From Swiss-Prot:
NADP(+) binds at residues 45-48, 68, 76, 78, 158. It comes from Blochmanniella floridana. Mg(2+) 1 binds at residues 217, 221. Pfam families: KARI_C, KARI_N. This is Ketol-acid reductoisomerase (NADP(+)). The gene is ilvC. The active site is at residue 132. Residues 17-208 form the KARI N-terminal Rossmann domain.
Length: 492
């Protein structure tokens, strides 16, 4: 595929993929000063557009929304949202020519046509912002040289961007300046100011590149973040129902279980998550995790290869041309899942029960997080970026499932993430049912094994604990989580 990334030399590709630096807190001492006097126009009022705009306004910035003329006339959902929260709204022709800083927060599929419309309207030396670099990297359209192009990519859905800000904190973000569009050398200061305005400076910011953000983001969302949560939800629910468990209980265990289990992941990595299990369950989860890795490694590697060479993007863009035929078909099929239709279970499930009854769910998380991290790092992506795109974002995506199951997750994430998620889960789910089910035991999704007398091999337990603690993702996780010590814990 002839895109920006594929036009780079091999050395340039390695450089861009490996661009990653954890920024120091004192680098953000100027706060939002660089943007205080700017007229900022956000295009798009979806999940990221609305919630970033709310944070930026609360940080003292001047925010308006530019929408298509027909969206205003017909009072689209974006128009209704912007008006509900008291923002000024105008057309592209009305707002873009006066804007100092234009932030493009519409879905990836519309970026190319949008830039064709707004670039002639943008004033000399204006700034163009993205929160995902797909248009720059995968399509590769050149932006006018006098325009500075920057990115702030929060590592979570838009709803969580707002919630963490309202808690007085923020979410980690990757920031970058497109090296072909930084003629005046102001891009980084503006990107830092933008990051401060949404609260990311409080949670950890990586200085990255458009390439590293796009390739790691696509890999994370397709595999561990959305793909495996979807596969795991369907697989675990179906298995419990097949084993005779009440469908309401099974639905609640899965729906809320990801959030409860990954809260431990957020606070203390895989080590803490595994420590919430009994010794018997920990040994079993470790064993199941290894089996999953053996089955899934070729699949994860294939997704990474397709992302790097552009095959994934090419096929998705063909679906755009075909009016999202595949995406809409996947979406319809997903709405008919038994898990999505499971009855509400009204009785309380205690926090520890989610761990005790969800050994398989813990194993799925461990396997997919470590596998995605390892493959990204092998591909040239730095451990810090790989951590944010695997372990860190997982609890934030799990929170969406806890609200309204897979429907909520797929509604909140981008169309790009949703398409990749379906592509992954459509292949992996039958694979696991064929190759992984034979390894399962009754106790992997209930407590039946706990009452059995099991001899614990102390040496084996010691060695497994050591392997868990010394995995590279645990080492980088300790450093990155230190920036998030003010993060509020969820209670269940």
């Amino acid at each position: 595929m002839n895109n920006y990334f594929n036009k780079l030399t091999f050395i340039q590709k390695i450089k861009h993929l490996g661009q990653c630096r954890l920024m120091k807190k004192n680098e953000f001492s100027d706060g939002v000063r660089a943007l205080l006097s700017k007229k900022i126009v956000i295009i798009g009022c979806g999940s990221q557009g609305l919630n970033q705009g709310l944070n930026m306004r609360d940080s003292g910035l001047n925010i308006t929304y530019a929408l298509r003329r027909d969206s205003i006339i017909n009072q689209s959902q974006s128009y209704i949202r912007a008006m509900k929260y008291g923002f000024s709204v105008g057309t592209y022709d009305e707002l873009i020519p006066e804007a100092d800083f234009v932030i493009n927060l519409i879905p990836d599929k519309y970026h190319e046509s949008l830039i064709q419309k707004i670039e002639p309207l943008m004033k000399y030396k204006a700034v163009l912002g993205y929160s995902h670099g797909f248009h720059i990297v995968e399509i590769g359209v050149k932006i006018r040289q006098d325009i500075t192009v920057i990115m702030v990519a929060p590592k979570c859905p838009g709803t969580e961007v707002r919630q963490e800000y309202q808690r007085g904190f923020g979410v980690p973000a990757l920031i970058a300046v497109h090296e072909e569009n930084n003629a005046y050398g102001t891009g980084m200061e503006l990107a830092k100011s933008w990051a401060c305005s949404i609260g990311s400076n409080k949670a950890g910011v990586l200085e990255s590149s458009f390439v590293a953000e796009v390739k790691s983001d696509l890999m994370g969302e397709q595999t561990v973040l959305c793909g495996m949560l979807q596969v795991g939800s369907i697989f675990c629910f179906d298995k419990m129902v097949e084993d005779g468990l009440d469908s309401g209980y099974a639905g609640k265990l899965v729906q809320n279980g990801w959030e409860v289990i990954t809260e431990a992941l957020k606070q203390g990595g895989i080590t803490l998550m595994m420590d919430r299990l009994s010794n018997v369950s920990k040994l079993r989860a470790f064993e199941l995790s290894d089996q999953l890795k053996n089955i899934l490694t070729p699949v994860f590697e294939k997704h990474m290869e397709d992302i790097l060479d552009g095959s994934f993007s090419k096929n998705m863009m063909l679906d755009w041309i075909n009016k999202d035929c595949k995406l809409l078909s996947y979406r319809q099929n997903n709405s008919q899942l038994l898990f999505e239709k499971a009855p509400v279970y009204c009785e309380t499930i205690l926090e520890q029960t989610y761990f005790d009854h969800g050994v398989l769910m813990v194993a799925i998380i461990k396997a997919s997080v470590e596998l995605a991290f390892d493959i990204m790092v092998k591909s040239g992506i730095k451990p810090e970026s790989a951590y944010y795109e695997s372990l860190h974002e997982l609890p934030l995506i799990a929170n969406t499932i806890a609200r309204k199951r897979l429907y909520e997750m797929n509604m909140v994430i981008s169309d790009t993430a949703e398409y990749g998620n379906y592509l992954f889960s459509d292949f992996v789910l039958p694979l696991l049912k064929k190759e992984f089910v034979p390894y399962l035991k009754r106790g992997d999704l209930d407590l039946s094994h706990v009452n059995n007398i099991v001899h614990i091999d102390n040496i084996l337990l010691r060695d497994i604990n050591e392997m868990i603690r010394t995995h590279p993702i645990e080492k980088v996780g300790v450093q990155l989580r230190s920036y998030m010590k003010d993060m509020v814990s969820l209670s269940f």
